Amino acid sequence: KPKEDKEWVKFKAKHITSQSVADFNCNKTMNDPDFTPDGQCKPVNTFIHSNTGPVKDICRRASGRVNKSSTQQFPLTTCNKPIRCKYSQSNTTNFICITCRDNYPVHFVKIGKC
C-alpha cells in the first residue's frame, strides 16, 4: 500500500469533516489549538461535509499536479473573517475545485467548478 501523501493528510484535517452541517460550529472548530498552532486566527476556511472517499475520488487518474472539479455537489460550510476570532458561518451545497497531486487532493481552490 503506498504511503499517503502528507499534503492529503493535511487537506483532510483542514477541509473534511464528518460532522453534519447542523452540528458544525465554526467558532469551536476554527479556534481549536490544532487549527491555530501559532495562535493566529485563520481568516477563512471551507469545510466539506463528507467522508474522505468521495473527495479523494475527484483526484482519481489525476497524474502530476492539476486542478479538478468534483462531478457531484457537496454540503459545504465556510467560516469567514474573524473579528477577535469570532467567525461568521455560511452553508451551501455546490461543486468544489481542488488541486490534485498524483491522485491525492492537496489544496482547496474554491467553491464551484474550476
Curated annotation (Swiss-Prot):
Belongs to the pancreatic ribonuclease family. GO terms for molecular function: endonuclease activity; nucleic acid binding; RNA nuclease activity. There are at least five different forms arising from glycan heterogeneity. Endonuclease, hydrolyzes highly polymerized RNA, poly(U) and poly(C), and the dinucleotides CpA and UpA. Hydrolyzes rCA, rUA and rUG. Has cytotoxic activity against cultured human submaxillary gland carcinoma cells. Disulfide bonds join 26-79, 41-85, 59-100, 97-114. Its main location: secreted. PANTHER family: RIBONUCLEASE, RNASE 3. Glycans are attached at residues 27, 67, 91. It is found in: Secreted. GO terms for cellular component: extracellular region. Gene3D superfamilies: Ribonuclease A-like domain. Its EC number is 3.1.27.-. Monomer. Substrate binds at residues 42-46. GO terms for biological process: defense response to Gram-positive bacterium. It is an enzyme of class 3 (hydrolase). The active site is at residues 15, 107. Keywords: Disulfide bond, Endonuclease, Glycoprotein, Hydrolase, Nuclease, Secreted. Transmembrane segments: none annotated. This is Amphinase-4.
